Amino acid sequence: RERCYITKENSNQFPQLVKFIEELRSAEVHKKIGSLIGRDLSNSFVRLEVICDREGFWLKPHCDIKEKLMSSIVFVNPHGESENLGTDFYDEKLNKVKTVPYKNNYGYFFTSGPNTWHGMEKKEIKKERRCIQINYVTFATDWQVKN
């Protein structure tokens, strides 16, 4: 499992992702997303993480911390991995109710809460399961939103 947060320190290695972060920071975008999820994002920070999971990876069902105002994943599937490798969502009794398909350039977003259980059961990963995780958070990152 490899993970890399995009920071000002490593931003020169990820110019396209920095452009994406700048869009997410813009008042127009964060206000629109805030209206969709019913949250005020005007004092938040963007956190973007590049994720590369390999064989053996799994993530137990959990709810995100309250400091994550919005969680989002965009799947990047250049190796034709199984669509079954998407995120699993669970009910309050931890019964799996939905797997979001792991398709290239496909994703989802949601807000944190007491019944937002998600994770990934252990599944066969042939090469890599890549995705980009985007969060609006209450704690400081290098990318405060603009107002």
Set out the residue ranges of the language-model regions.
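Short hydrophobic/aromatic beta-strand micro-patches
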Residues: 75
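Short amphipathic alpha-helical segments, especially helix-boundary/capping motifs
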Residues: 5-11, 32-33, 46-50, 93-95, ...
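Short secondary-structure capping micro-motifs at structural edges
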Residues: 17-20, 57-61
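Non-heme Fe(II)/2-oxoglutarate
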Residues: 1-36
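Catalytic core of Fe(II)/2-oxoglutarate
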Residues: 51, 56-57, 63-68, 78-147
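A short coil-to-beta-strand element that immediately follows conserved catalytic motifs
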Residues: 38-49, 83
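Short, conserved, surface-exposed binding loops centered on an aromatic residue
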Residues: 22, 35, 39-42, 61-65
